[in-house]
């Protein structure tokens, strides 16, 4: 019997021979991970057995490269994968860990447990806590804060984080809150903004997280930026980058000249509405930007000849300037989600 497919999608993988990062179509099975050069390929480029393997996340071996996790096999071979964003990494890590645990216990992988899970008081689910903190109504309020002639947008103070943890009854006291906030920082759920919080993370303070009104932090993917006399680390972002990120992930994009298809990481922002696309293997600057205000986005079932397209899950964006972009999602559900999100963003802001 074929092993069950648990999860699949695009991840960026580090080459085992050369120090190159390339997007791959990755499939998590009950007993291993297969990776393909393209989603349409029939045979995988490689397979990683999960029995006896260990998983490290977050993996911080590569400096500025975020959302990386590492799988080490029983033969001490390291395999590095990079997700497009934090929640995507966490979803892969959660399923891989569960698959490894199921192999060890001789069990079949199942998403829903038939037994009621008993949550111990001292056990904190950082992923769930992060989502609660980001809740627009009940979560931590993102502010524009000023310090040292700089304006930090979409951020909050260290003491606000501890205040929220205590008032939300996630922790019993501020000392326990400091421990949880440090864990959130170490796992990448919070990012330091400004010299004070960055110095604490770099080890010049006793605790990596500071319960302090002058220590600033932000959520990854929040649209954080710093204005005015900014340092090299706090880049002044253009107007088009100021919108809040509402969706991101990898899609196939057709080139305008050669008409070939390549995997690109897309980040969708609203107000102003822009869809930026990047080389998923690591470039920080976008390859291009699609201004979505007044655009039309539709699913594509047939090509210009009227015949049914051989490519599945296609959709097209036509900008107000009548530039056409053809994109391909991995599944019908993913295509629908992208179309709805782009349509919603195109009606907001500038």
UniProtKB/Swiss-Prot annotation:
Residues 4-101, 244-347 form the PH domain. The modification Phosphoserine is found at residues 113, 117. Keywords: Acetylation, Phosphoprotein, Repeat. Pfam families: DEP, PH. It comes from the Eukaryota. The keyword Acetylation applies. Residues 136-221 form the DEP domain. The modification N6-acetyllysine is found at residue 64. InterPro entries: DEP_dom (IPR000591), PH-like_dom_sf (IPR011993), PH_domain (IPR001849), Pleckstrin (IPR037370), PLEK_DEP (IPR037371), WH-like_DNA-bd_sf (IPR036388), WH_DNA-bd_sf (IPR036390). PROSITE patterns: DEP (PS50186), PH_DOMAIN (PS50003). CDD domains: DEP_PLEK1, PH1_Pleckstrin_2, PH2_Pleckstrin_2. GO terms for cellular component: cytoplasm; cytosol; extracellular region; membrane; plasma membrane; ruffle membrane. One of its GO terms (molecular function) is protein homodimerization activity. GO terms for biological process: actin cytoskeleton organization; cell projection organization; cortical actin cytoskeleton organization; hematopoietic progenitor cell differentiation; integrin-mediated signaling pathway; intracellular signal transduction; negative regulation of calcium-mediated signaling; negative regulation of G protein-coupled receptor signaling pathway. Major protein kinase C substrate of platelets. This is Pleckstrin. It comes from Homo sapiens (Human).
């Amino acid at each position: 019997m074929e092993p069950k497919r648990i999860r699949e999608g695009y991840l960026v993988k580090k080459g085992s021979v050369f120090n190159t990062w390339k997007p791959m179509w990755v499939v998590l099975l009950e007993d291993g991970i297969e990776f393909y050069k393209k989603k349409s390929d029939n045979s995988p480029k490689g397979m990683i057995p999960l029995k006896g393997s260990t998983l490290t996340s977050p993996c911080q071996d590569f400096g500025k490269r975020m959302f990386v996790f590492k799988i080490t096999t029983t033969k001490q071979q390291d395999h590095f994968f990079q997700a497009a964003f934090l929640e995507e990494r966490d979803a892969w890590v959660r399923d891989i860990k569960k698959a490894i645990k199921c192999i060890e216990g001789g069990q079949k992988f199942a998403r829903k447990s038939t037994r009621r899970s008993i949550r111990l008081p001292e056990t904190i689910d950082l992923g769930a806590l992060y989502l609660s903190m980001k809740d627009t109504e009940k979560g931590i309020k993102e502010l524009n804060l000023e310090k040292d002639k700089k304006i930090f947008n979409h951020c909050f103070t260290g003491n606000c984080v501890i205040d929220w943890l205590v008032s939300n009854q996630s922790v019993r006291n501020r000392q326990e809150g400091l421990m949880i906030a440090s864990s959130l920082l170490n796992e990448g759920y919070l990012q330091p903004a400004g010299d004070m919080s960055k110095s604490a993370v770099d080890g010049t303070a006793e605790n990596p997280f500071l319960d302090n009104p002058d220590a600033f932090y932000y959520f990854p993917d929040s649209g954080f930026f710093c204005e005015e006399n900014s340092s090299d680390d706090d880049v002044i972002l253009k107007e088009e980058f100021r919108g809040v990120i509402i969706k991101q992930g990898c899609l196939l994009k057709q080139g305008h000249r050669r008409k070939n298809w390549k995997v690109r990481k897309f980040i969708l922002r609203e107000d102003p509405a822009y869809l930026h696309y990047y080389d998923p293997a690591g470039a920080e600057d976008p390859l291009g930007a699609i201004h979505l205000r007044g655009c039309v986005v539709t699913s594509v079932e047939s090509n210009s000849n009227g015949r049914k397209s051989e490519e599945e899950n296609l959709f097209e964006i036509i900008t107000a300037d009548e530039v056409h972009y053809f994109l391909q999602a991995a599944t019908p559900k993913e295509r629908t989600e992208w179309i709805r999100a782009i349509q919603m963003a195109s009606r907001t802001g500038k």
